[in-house]
Amino acid sequence: MTGAVPGAGYRLAACAEMLFVDRPFLERVRRIADAGFLVEIWDWTSKDIEALAASGATIVSMTGYVTGNLTQPDGAAQLLAGAARSVAVAERLNCPALNLHGTGLGEGGKPVRPVEVVTGTDWVAAVRTLERVAALGERAGRVFHLENLNTAVDHPGTPFARAADTLALVEAVGSPFLRMNLDLYHAQIGEGNLIELVQRAGDAIGEIQVADVPGRCERARERSTTRRSRPRCGRWATAG
């Protein structure tokens, strides 16, 4: 199976970092593939790349950097070097999309260099760095996705975290090799209005990620917010 949704313009992938977590990573990937889904992985530096390539799974998204950030000269150089290494791994895995964040994330998803105030200079530097990332993607035939995060719960101090921020950066670069990874879990926590957000982002979206709020699961259905919007977001994506 290919993860295709009949009658829809999108395919479904499942994240191997979040499922079957009591199992070895390669087994998680195989279980997801056997269930008919495409596969997403995160940090490739801790993975057995050759084993993943031989697994038979279709890996469609992976982290596209190792360290660094978008704004500081040394951080941008690190990010671009890591992006080049990531592209080489993506080619080995035949993975079409590589994921980025507004800054490098460390232990527990916290930014390595927290930023409380993003300046105009930071915005200009971020666009310049992302232009170089997009150029790298164009040369390699891969698309980089810039993901929004939330600062209230999971990633405090992350610059360019809001969906509105990531969308603005993607639109400023204006390259088909840099798209938005619209994470509805993070967007619901940080901004809400998911349907309007999907409509606003439109063609800038390269990927949409879905997890329930709170807690990325459906244990507390009576408190869930994203689950009420998911069907309508899906219908809009299919129609679009």
Task: Map each language-model feature to its residues.
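Active-site groove signature of glycoside hydrolases
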Residues: 86, 90-115, 140-152
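N-terminal pre-domain/capping segments
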Residues: 1-96, 175-179, 231
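Surface-exposed, active-site-proximal loop segments in enzymatic domains
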Residues: 64-81, 104-122
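Residues at the N-termini of beta-strands
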Residues: 38-39, 97, 207, 240
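A short helix->loop->beta-strand "cap" motif at the edges of active sites that frequently abuts
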Residues: 57, 95-96, 142, 236-240
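Flexible, glycine- and charge-enriched loops at secondary-structure boundaries
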Residues: 25, 76, 80, 115-123, ...
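Acidic/histidine-rich catalytic cores of soluble enzymes
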Residues: 30-33, 62, 127-235
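Active-site-proximal loop/turn and secondary-structure-junction residues that shape catalytic pockets
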Residues: 18-20, 43-45, 65-66, 102-106, ...
